[in-house]
Amino acid sequence: MPRKGHVQKREILPDPMYNSKLVTSLIDHLMIDGKRGTATKILYAAFDEIKNETGNDPVEVFQQAMENVMPVLEVKARRVGGSNYQVPIEVRPDRRTTLGLRWIVQYARLRGEHTMVERLAREIIDASNNTGASVKKREDTHRMAEANRAFAHYRW
C-alpha cells in the first residue's frame, strides 16, 4: 500500500476489432506467459464460433454472460474475539468485472471440449443462457453470503 496518495489505475485501451474494453480485459485474463497474440486468436475464434452458433453479435452475448456471472455479494473472513466469521459484503464494480472474467476463463479451462476455442465459446454461451459452471459459482457465492447474513453487522 502506498504511503503517498492513491495509485493511478492503468488505462485499458479498447480492443481494435470489437472496440470494447471488456473484450481487452478478457484477452488479458486468457493470456498465459505474456502471449497476447495467442490469447487474441483464441478469443476471436471463440467469438466467430459464438456468432455461427447463436446468430447474434458475440460481444452482446459476452456482455449478457458477464451480467449473469458477476457477483453482487461475497463473503470476507473477519476475526472477532478469537473466531473467524464469514462476513457478507457488497462487491465493488471493478471487482465484480474481474471476478466475472476470472470465473468464465477458469471454468472454460476445466471444460471437456477439445480446444480452448470451443471451451471458451461454450462457456460464454452457457453463461449467457444462465447455465454453466461460472454461473453456478456466482450462485454459490451468493448462497454463502445469504447463509452468513447474521454476521453482516461485523462489516467494517
Swiss-Prot record:
SUPFAM superfamilies: Ribosomal protein S7. Keywords: Ribonucleoprotein, Ribosomal protein, RNA-binding, rRNA-binding, tRNA-binding. This is Small ribosomal subunit protein uS7. Signal peptide: none annotated. The gene is rpsG. One of its GO terms (molecular function) is tRNA binding. InterPro entries: Ribosomal_uS7, Ribosomal_uS7_bac/org-type, Ribosomal_uS7_CS, Ribosomal_uS7_dom, Ribosomal_uS7_dom_sf. GO terms for biological process: translation. It comes from Limosilactobacillus reuteri (strain DSM 20016). Pfam families: Ribosomal_S7. Coiled coil: none annotated. Belongs to the universal ribosomal protein uS7 family. The lineage of its organism: Bacteria, Bacillati, Bacillota, Bacilli, Lactobacillales. GO terms for cellular component: small ribosomal subunit. Part of the 30S ribosomal subunit. Contacts proteins S9 and S11. One of the primary rRNA binding proteins, it binds directly to 16S rRNA where it nucleates assembly of the head domain of the 30S subunit. Is located at the subunit interface close to the decoding center, probably blocks exit of the E-site tRNA.
